[in-house]
Amino acid sequence: MKNPPAPTHDLIWYGPLFEGEIHTDESSFLAIKNQKSQSAFAPVKLLVDTGSNISGIDHSIVKRLSLPRYQNPARVDGVGGIHSVGLYRCILFLRIFGMKGLPLDVVAGDYRHSPYDGIIGRDVLQFCKFTFDGPGNKFVLEAINF
């Protein structure tokens, strides 16, 4: 099945945002996509962050969906040094993936004062082509061989 064409999105002052969904696991994702269940999922706005090697979502989403946590924390090198943060498993759905979901490990962060719910890092971008047109005030994110 071919992925849908990648739409062009307008840039906003804080960067490229992309809408998606966070699902708890593969079975709930498939049940929702096959219209066999009303399992909980979270619609999200995610900032494309090419400088991050791992994606992250807000603590409130992790809590609301009761995402499974790994026993060992992730070590993230960011502003202020290296931090130890919770690492969780989820399924990320972006429209550019067609009907597929991406099993993903994410870190939980504090995005409550941001206009987005988390970030898309290079762990997701490795499956995508990201085109950033600053002068045109546009960006395109498309799935490649997904």
Regions found by a protein language model. Name each.
Residues 1-146:
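Pepsin/retropepsin-fold aspartyl endopeptidases
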